Regions:
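A bilobed periplasmic-binding-protein/Venus flytrap-type ligand-binding module shared by bacterial periplasmic
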Residues: 109-113, 171-199, 212
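Short, well-ordered beta-strand elements
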Residues: 36-38, 93-96, 106-107, 123-128, ...
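Gly/Pro-rich hinge or "lid" segments in bacterial periplasmic/extracellular proteins
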Residues: 22, 44, 52-120, 124, ...
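Append "and occasionally in soluble cytosolic enzymes with long acidic Gly/Pro-rich linkers
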Residues: 192-308
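Extracytoplasmic/peripheral linker and loop segments enriched in polar/acidic and small residues
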Residues: 20, 27-29, 198, 210, ...
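Aromatic- and charge-enriched surface segment that lines or borders ligand/interaction sites
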Residues: 1-7, 37, 136-139, 190-192, ...
Length: 370
């Protein structure tokens, strides 16, 4: 179902390693329905990780296809996700969603039909749905929540010595994405547009963002693939070795970790922009664009850091904040110039960080090839 083009699933490309993709997947079930045999088109070191990813979870066909709104008036699939828009749908996990107040809360109840139900200890799980860091933190302090994974940025320093505050590594990258179809690049050659993006990158003081916003030991990203990613052969992917050495060997990346204002100016000049003797962008060739982010104190703080960095040479960047759903929809639709983004690995293989950049990927927010 997820591989079916009619479903238009964001993660449909995850099935492309299965023989017969996308029209006739070579997957068969045993007579007792308890075993699946999957034939791969090529060796895949991370396939078992894929099998544990939500896109590969089993769903009940009757539940999906009988949902109100699933089919349009002409009989074609209108909304493939209609079956899971409200609480009470059939699922196969340890818990079932029994109550859902949209944008407010969710309640999950132990599923007695789960295959390992006897080892599921908690009867209910209650979730608070909010994008407000301050409200989430207040709910934790008042005892309404037992666990949270976000706190207001201005609370981080005071929490570093708190035994309840845990810093956990993530295999992921926080980044800024450019809409390649944006008017920002109108009239520019492919090379000039690339020079503009590289120039903006050289102006951003990543270490300052880590020290003042992140505050928990994040590392500068000099490549999109993060440190610690497996190479599929028992080693680490991001390394200098006999097969490949990064252009900036010391930073293990494609550019250095330091701000390079002079280099940025030279790149912008090559893209057709003029500068005065003081190194400020000429009024004759202005650069002005909008930065899209969701309403979260940390994301907004990072946007403000970038805004200040670019302003140092006269680039005008305005910040547009919006709620989570609007933010996701606008970014996916390409209704932005530059947007904050982030990707935490779904499984430990570099391909997970790379497949999202293809034209037909559901996560192609930068609009490559569109």
């Amino acid at each position: 179902r997820a591989a079916n083009p009619e479903t238009a699933a964001d993660y449909s490309y995850m099935f492309n390693g299965i023989a017969g993709y996308p029209d006739n997947l070579d997957v068969t079930a045993s007579e007792d329905g308890k075993t699946l045999t999957v034939v791969l088109s090529a060796p895949c070191a991370y396939f078992l990780d894929l099998a544990a990813f939500p896109t590969f979870y089993a769903v009940k066909q009757e539940t999906v296809e009988s949902a109100e709104g699933y089919l349009g008036d002409d009989g074609s699939v209108q909304n493939p996700g209609a079956w899971a828009l409200e609480a009470g749908f059939v699922s196969s996990g340890a818990y079932t969603l029994t109550e859902w107040k949209h944008n407010e809360s969710m309640v999950y109840t132990k599923n007695p039909y789960y295959w390992d139900a006897e080892n599921v200890k908690l009867e209910t799980l209650e979730f608070m749905l909010s994008a407000d860091d301050t409200a989430i933190y207040a709910a934790y302090n008042s005892g309404d929540l037992d666990f949270i994974d976000t706190v207001p940025n201005d609370e981080i320093q005071s929490l570093l010595e708190n035994p309840e505050f845990h810093i956990v590594d993530q295999l992921g990258t926080y980044y800024i994405c450019f809409n390649v179809k944006s008017d920002l690049f109108a009239g520019k050659t492919v090379e000039q547009a690339a020079d503009m993006r590289k120039a903006f990158s050289k102006l951003i003081d990543r270490q300052y963002i880590i020290d003042t916003v992140g505050q928990t030991g994040q590392k500068i990203a000099a490549t999109f693939i993060p440190e610690g990613m497996a190479d599929g052969n028992g080693g680490i992917f991001k390394a200098n070795d006999d097969a490949y050495t990064f252009p900036d060997a010391e930073a293990l990346g494609y550019y250095g970790e330091e701000v390079d204002t002079e280099g940025a100016i030279e790149l912008l000049k090559s893209a057709g922009y003029e500068f005065d003797d003081s190194g400020m962008l000429s009024a004759d060739t202005p650069i002005s664009f909008e930065y899209l982010t969701n309403e979260s104190s940390g994301h907004i703080a990072i946007a403000e850091c970038v805004q200040q960095d670019l302003a140092m040479i006269g680039i005008d960047m305005t910040i547009r904040t919006c709620d989570w759903n609007v933010f996701l929809n606008d970014r996916k639709a390409g209704n932005y110039d530059i947007a904050r983004n982030g990707w935490v690995a779904d499984f430990n293989d570099p391909i997970n960080m790379l497949e999202m950049w293809t034209t037909d990927s559901g996560n192609n927010d930068v609009q490559f090839g569109r």
